[in-house]
């Protein structure tokens, strides 16, 4: 860990705990800051706060009192899930208190160069692919960030012989100042999280923060399937390395079924260990990073051929009576489900879809669901999803939850079919998060197998 002095004796408020807040509080204390932690959960029900108090860190729990900001804090480090219109954050900004997320702290102390991956879809899969390729190629890629390992915790233990492979959300990227990856990847940009950001333009601006401090010695990898990425490519100091599945570019691209980097064939798309056009895009981004990092072609091909996916991201679960089950619970928007379906023969797919109703219609999904064997529909958004199914001419059945939907889908399936959980909706109408939803699917499949 780098030895830094800029936070010594600074009064810092950590707003919100969870994994990242707890890690940030401990790191700040280690760096000599005077730390106060504020979390909305009551102290009696808050083991993280109890643990921090035992370590000598001040904690304020059970609410977010605005008067706490009268204590002359010089910095706020907030949980990325807390919005900027939260009264505590808004008041801090009024007082001109800098507001960071923990990835800024991670950058400040990391001895390792950083590869930062962001985007609307494919972040986790691409991040995991990159780390796997680096490790197989002898480069020591260490996962961190939005993938479940707090960056500020992981960054303390890496050395300059490692590479910190960091998944970054738009929420995290709103709270950076000096953060400077050597390689940045933007998988794609679609209109998601507008309820948080207010507009697509603000969302894109948050993502684009990833390259603010990059120079001509750095690389940014952009998806040239999108015109927006081509526009953004003119607005960075970093060297742009494009990838595309629709045209030959000066980077990584798909041509006649082959995956190329700057004219050199590395492997064929049908050799990838995970299905779907979206995973071809993820693989191309990974190839670009790997080639820039000096990984051999053999290591790239071996890794991508054996890569089995990420839990809840088009994850193969099991086969029962020659029926395959795939868990794609992470598909919380229409684009993600479209990409999941692209990897299968619709006539053999029973799709489980539906979830939180955000007022979206699903007409965009009609071409992608046309020809499905059946759909099983659940959740608040069920009436809207059913309208799309009717327009597509797809037969559907109702289910009360994911377990029920999985059982119904299996009853409708024949040998050679695929049962695909790819909801195209967030999970919060029924489940705490998409992981819990996906775990219910996996557990139900296990029970069906007996």
Curated annotation (Swiss-Prot):
Catalytic activity: UDP-N-acetyl-alpha-D-muramoyl-L-alanine + D-glutamate + ATP = UDP-N-acetyl-alpha-D-muramoyl-L-alanyl-D-glutamate + ADP + phosphate + H(+)
EC number: 6.3.2.9
Record keyword Coiled coil present: no
Subcellular location: Cytoplasm
Enzymatic class: ligase
Paired cysteines (S-S): none
Coiled-coil blocks: none
Source species, domain of life: Bacteria
Pathway: Cell wall biogenesis; peptidoglycan biosynthesis
GO cellular component, one term: cytoplasm
Alphabetized Gene3D superfamilies for the sequence: Mur ligase, C-terminal domain, Mur-like, catalytic domain, NAD(P)-binding Rossmann-like Domain
Main location: cytoplasm
GO molecular function, one term: UDP-N-acetylmuramoylalanine-D-glutamate ligase activity
Keywords carried by this UniProt record: ATP-binding, Cell cycle, Cell division, Cell shape, Cell wall biogenesis/degradation, Cytoplasm, Ligase, Nucleotide-binding, Peptidoglycan synthesis
UniProt-listed Pfam families: Mur_ligase_C, Mur_ligase_M, MurD-like_N
Residues binding ATP: 119-125
Gene Ontology terms describing biological process: cell division; cell wall organization; peptidoglycan biosynthetic process; regulation of cell shape
Family to which the UniProt record says this protein belongs: Belongs to the MurCDEF family.
Function text: Cell wall formation. Catalyzes the addition of glutamate to the nucleotide precursor UDP-N-acetylmuramoyl-L-alanine (UMA).
Protein's UniProt name: UDP-N-acetylmuramoylalanine--D-glutamate ligase
Species name: Streptococcus thermophilus (strain ATCC BAA-250 / LMG 18311)
Gene that encodes it: murD
């Amino acid at each position: 860990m780098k030895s830094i002095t800029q936070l010594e004796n600074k009064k810092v408020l950590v707003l919100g705990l969870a994994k990242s807040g707890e890690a940030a509080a401990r790191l700040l204390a280690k760096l000599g800051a005077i730390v106060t932690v504020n979390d909305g959960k009551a102290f009696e029900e808050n083991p993280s706060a109890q643990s921090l108090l035992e370590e000598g860190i001040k904690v304020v729990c059970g609410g977010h009192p605005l008067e706490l900001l009268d204590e002359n804090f010089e910095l706020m480090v907030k949980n990325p899930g807390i919005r900027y219109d939260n009264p505590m954050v808004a008041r801090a900004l009024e007082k001109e208190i800098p507001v960071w997320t923990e990835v800024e702290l991670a950058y400040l102390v990391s001895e390792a160069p950083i590869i930062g991956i962001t985007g609307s879809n494919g972040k986790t899969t691409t991040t995991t692919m990159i780390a796997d390729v680096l490790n197989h190629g002898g480069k020591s890629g260490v996962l961190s960030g939005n993938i479940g390992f707090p960056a500020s915790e992981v960054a303390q233990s890496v050395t300059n012989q490692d590479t910190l492979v960091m998944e970054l959300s738009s929420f995290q990227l709103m709270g950076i100042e000096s953060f400077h990856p050597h390689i940045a990847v933007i998988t794609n940009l679609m209109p998601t999280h507008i309820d948080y950001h207010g507009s697509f333009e603000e969302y894109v601006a948050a993502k684009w923060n990833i390259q603010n401090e990059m120079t001509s010695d750095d690389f940014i990898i952009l998806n040239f399937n999108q015109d927006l990425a081509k526009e953004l490519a003119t607005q960075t100091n970093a060297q742009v390395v494009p990838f595309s599945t629709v045209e030959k570019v000066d980077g990584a691209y798909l041509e006649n079924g082959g995956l190329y980097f700057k004219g050199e064939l590395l492997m064929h798309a049908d050799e990838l260990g995970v299905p779907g056009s979206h995973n071809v895009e993820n693989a191309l981004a990974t190839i670009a990073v790997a080639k820039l990092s000096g990984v051999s072609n053999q290591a790239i091909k071996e890794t991508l051929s054996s890569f089995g996916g990420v839990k809840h991201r088009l994850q193969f679960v099991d086969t029962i009576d020659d029926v395959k089950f795939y868990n794609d619970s992470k598909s919380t928007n229409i684009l993600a489900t479209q990409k999941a379906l692209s990897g299968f023969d619709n006539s053999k797919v029973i799709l489980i879809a539906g979830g939180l109703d955000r007022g979206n219609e699903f007409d965009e999904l009609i071409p992608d669901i046309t020809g499905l064997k059946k759909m099983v529909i659940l959740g608040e958004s069920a009436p809207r999803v059913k309208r799309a199914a009717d327009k597509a001419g797809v037969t559907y059945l109702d289910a009360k939850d994911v377990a029920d939907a999985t059982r119904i889908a299996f009853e409708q399936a024949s040998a050679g079919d695929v049962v695909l959980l790819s909801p195209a909706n967030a999970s919060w109408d029924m489940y705490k998060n998409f992981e819990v939803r996906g775990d219910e699917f996996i557990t139900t499949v296990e029970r069906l197998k007996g």
